[in-house]
Amino acid sequence: MYSYIVEGGFKIGGQITASGNKNSALPCILAALLTNEDVILENIPNINDVKVVLDILSDIGADIVREGNALKIKVSNIVKTEIDSSFTDLIRASILLLGPFVSRFGEIDMALPGGDVIGKRRLDTHFYGLSKLGAKLINKDGRIVLKAKKLVGAEMFLDEASVTATENIIMASVLAEGNTVIMNAACEPHVQDLCNMLNSMGANILGIGSNVLEIKGVKKLRGTTFRIGADFMQVGSLISLAALTGGELEIKKADPQHFRLIRHIYSRLGINFEYDKENVYVRDKQELKVKLDFGGHIPKIDDGPWPAFPTDLMSIIIVTATQVEGTVLVFEKMFESRMFFVDKLIKMGAQIVLCDPHRVVVTGKSPLKGNVLSSPDVRAGMSLLIAAFVAEGRSEIQNVYQIERGYEDVANKLINLGAKIKKVKSQ
């Protein structure tokens, strides 16, 4: 186990290139299962979740070559369709094995996935969509067993716009016979990445970026070279970090086309940033003051499926709100346990009222003091790290494995921006 030792009170700024999006990298890596030809993926982040997925592929017989942030994957055949639970326990995204396995190999046997504990995360939408295509689900001793002799396209309406369910159904349907229509599909940037990658392999997916996808099945997919998009969660975290510490920051290759609503929400907290076709710019002088709603009412910030404000930035918004003047209600609609890290911010001196599992009221600006904190999940962990940089004195962030599941080379990248941080082995 490792910890970060952080000295707060220093400006963080400079120049950094955005890492690849973890939530794009994982499904795109697993989409390589759908062809027996070489798949080359660029801009893959070097993070723990990617390592686990690559270990799964190696364990079933895939050939993998990694050079820096590029991957070459070839899945000529596999040696088994049963996935070791030691892998699936570590990562929620292991659920994305279902679609490609049942599509190309006709079956899969795996344990229920692990990962972040931020609330109940249903699997029913996955099973509904895959069963509409012809897969049969067998619940065997707490394991997921799916079998399909043949997949046939179907029309379906998802009861929730689940990202991973949409991705599983897409991967299962690209090689299915006939047409598939997915209504109420997720349309996040990472879903768009997966669709664009599959189309570059010869798939026929229409409606990319919308909530209605039409997939015309093809007989075979070819290899491809595809570049993963930027991690807008990392970019959002860096915007907050620079703004709250008074730094001036340029984030290169940030895919700013995804930041329209994110910029609007940040502006409500007195944080403004600019962007051009590729880069994001954070200036060193920020207002850091809550903008009240009409009539002087306390503003509410809430999340939802894309293009609404992304749930993965809600933890970042909470810590940001502790450092701006004014009061804001933060309403997490999607996960009932994401808010349960705020006790750690309160321990540092934040003024936060936890109303219920979905809502907190944050009043700033609160001076924070360094403390010993443990990362409960990847996004809350980054929020605590931001709090440590803002706080007076020294903090220790424990269980950094959680942060490194989603953020690449955290300590070194922040050191290059002027941060005082070091990674040490925990006592």
Curated annotation (Swiss-Prot):
UniProt keywords, alphabetically: Cell cycle, Cell division, Cell shape, Cell wall biogenesis/degradation, Cytoplasm, Peptidoglycan synthesis, Transferase
NCBIfam families: murA, PRK09369.1
Pfam families tied to this protein: EPSP_synthase
Annotated protein name in UniProt: UDP-N-acetylglucosamine 1-carboxyvinyltransferase
EC numbers for this chain: 2.5.1.7
Database matches in InterPro entries: Enolpyruvate_Tfrase_dom, Enolpyruvate_Tfrase_sf, MurA_subfamily, RNA3'P_cycl/enolpyr_Trfase_a/b, UDP_GlcNAc_COvinyl_MurA
Subcellular locations according to the entry: Cytoplasm
Function: Cell wall formation. Adds enolpyruvyl to UDP-N-acetylglucosamine.
Keyword flag Cytoplasm: yes
Record flagged with keyword Transferase: yes
Active-site residues per Swiss-Prot or TrEMBL entry: 116 (proton donor)
Family of the protein in this entry: Belongs to the EPSP synthase family. MurA subfamily.
This protein's encoding gene: murA
UniProt-listed SUPFAM superfamilies: EPT/RTPC-like
Gene3D superfamilies: Enolpyruvate transferase domain
Reaction it catalyzes: phosphoenolpyruvate + UDP-N-acetyl-alpha-D-glucosamine = UDP-N-acetyl-3-O-(1-carboxyvinyl)-alpha-D-glucosamine + phosphate
Entry GO MF terms: UDP-N-acetylglucosamine 1-carboxyvinyltransferase activity
Pathway it works in: Cell wall biogenesis; peptidoglycan biosynthesis
UniProt-annotated binding residues for phosphoenolpyruvate: 22-23
Catalytic class of the enzyme: transferase
One GO cellular component term noted in the UniProt record for this chain: cytoplasm
